[in-house]
Amino acid sequence: MLAIRTVIAISAAVIALLGCGSGTGRDAPSDASAAGSPAPTQSASSANWTLGGVPCALIPVPAAAPLGIGTCPGVRPGAIVLSDVGQCTLNFLFLGSDGYSYIGTAGHCILGTSPFGGDAGEMAWDPGTGPVARDAGGNPIGEFAYAILQDPKDFSLIRLDPSVQASAGMCHFGGPTAVNDDNPGITEPVVLNWFGNGVGVGAVLPARSAVAAGMPSPDHVFAQGAAAPGDSGSGVISSDGRAVGVLVTVGVHTASVGSGGLDAGMIGMTRLTPQVERAKAVLGVDLVLQVAPAQ
């Protein structure tokens, strides 16, 4: 047992030092390249963002896939969302004190990424003024109300149209049953689950898991797992069904794994609570996470 814990501790130390910027990587595309061409292979030193101060590459946002696809139907955690930037994945559902329902995805799914890298700032939109969000079939589901891409936050909220029937339950895994704000140390591994829509792998491996060697930071988590373009925004839950955060970055890339360039290695997640608290302050709206039984 001591030997196992020592290996975990060493692995965690490597993650802390290298984070999602280790190894060889591809940058996420700029808004222009998101419309089609795959990003070139580059060294991770050209990562286009930082998470917790560690150089990272945001998960690429691919151009919208053919309408009607999707392995997680409806408007719920794990379903496809289409924006002006491209295709991403929805995370958690919230009820606002203003009477609207809101559902999340990643901030870079609407703010895009700068060709020069770095933060893209923070924006909020009044009802009726935000960019339109659509489901996998191209149907409008609402408008973006809030978005931030500013280390260590990468989060956005869609203000759902009152006619949209949304579900709180994550495809395959169920939940979230509550919020997970735990901060286990680096010798306490945590299994994390999400349902994504990675292009090339989403139809085959939409439900995936990763292992984090602890979650000591209240703002972000690094874990050993795999992600692909289109997974951006996926809600991440712990094995007991509680909401941990949002999948946003990749680091070590192995394009030969699977098809469509599955990114295997260190992945990065932003913790949920700090981002929701910031959104509440900016919007002036209280937001309550909607829960569902774990499966």
Regions found by a protein language model. Give the residues of each.
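Bacterial N-terminal signal peptides that target proteins for export
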Residues: 1-8
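Catalytic nucleophile loop of clan PA
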Residues: 225-247, 256
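C-terminal cap/linker of serine protease catalytic domains
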Residues: 160-177, 248-295
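Protease-domain processing segments flanking chymotrypsin-fold serine proteases, especially trypsin-like
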Residues: 20-104, 113-135, 140-146, 289-295
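Hydrophobic helical h-region of N-terminal Sec-dependent signal peptides
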Residues: 9-14
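Serine endopeptidase catalytic core focused on the charge-relay Asp
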Residues: 82-213, 238-239
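Short beta->alpha transition motifs characteristic of CBS
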Residues: 106-111, 197, 229, 245-254
